[in-house]
Amino acid sequence: MITDTCILHIEEVLELLPHRFPFLLVDRVLNFEKGKFLRAVKNVSFNEPFFQGHFPGKPIFPGVLILEAMAQATGILAFKSMGKLAPGEFYYFAAIDEARFKRPVQPGDQMILNVEFIKERCGVARFKGIATVNEEMACEASMMCARRKEI
């Protein structure tokens, strides 16, 4: 179980991210430093709607949603690092590279999302993300998000 100080509760996460149930995949932020890193939690519950079909009798958290959870964590770090958006702007998930899956994530797991700010240029930020369960790597990827006008 995590014993770190909770820095951002769900109410604050909801203020930063546009996602809502069933697509909000960050439950709380444990720690962050602007322009450096963010550590967040996703508690994986059997009640998640996708477990009905992924996979019946052997529920596994979809890998694409692990990546989405890390992308949402990078979005929070981007908001905290690069500041508030101007009217009509939005942070878009722009790219993912070198994604690797190392272990399945299952109901009952607590997934820790660690994202690290690498660099920012012209409104495009690069991040490194690692998702772990019980300190064992489940997924890693390089990601980018872009600050752009809303489409």
Swiss-Prot record:
One MF annotation (Gene Ontology) recorded for this entry: (3R)-hydroxyacyl-[acyl-carrier-protein] dehydratase activity
Bridged cysteine pairs (disulfide): none
UniProt keyword list: Cytoplasm, Lipid A biosynthesis, Lipid biosynthesis, Lipid metabolism, Lyase
Gene Ontology BP annotations: fatty acid biosynthetic process; lipid A biosynthetic process
Catalytic center residues: H54
E.C. number: 4.2.1.59
GO terms under cellular component: cytoplasm; membrane
Subcellular location: Cytoplasm
Catalytic activity: a (3R)-hydroxyacyl-[ACP] = a (2E)-enoyl-[ACP] + H2O
EC category: lyase
Broad class of where this protein is predominantly found: cytoplasm
Role summary: Involved in unsaturated fatty acids biosynthesis. Catalyzes the dehydration of short chain beta-hydroxyacyl-ACPs and long chain saturated and unsaturated beta-hydroxyacyl-ACPs.
NCBIfam families, A to Z: fabZ, PRK00006.1
Family named by the database record: Belongs to the thioester dehydratase family. FabZ subfamily.
Name of the protein in question: 3-hydroxyacyl-[acyl-carrier-protein] dehydratase FabZ
Gene: fabZ
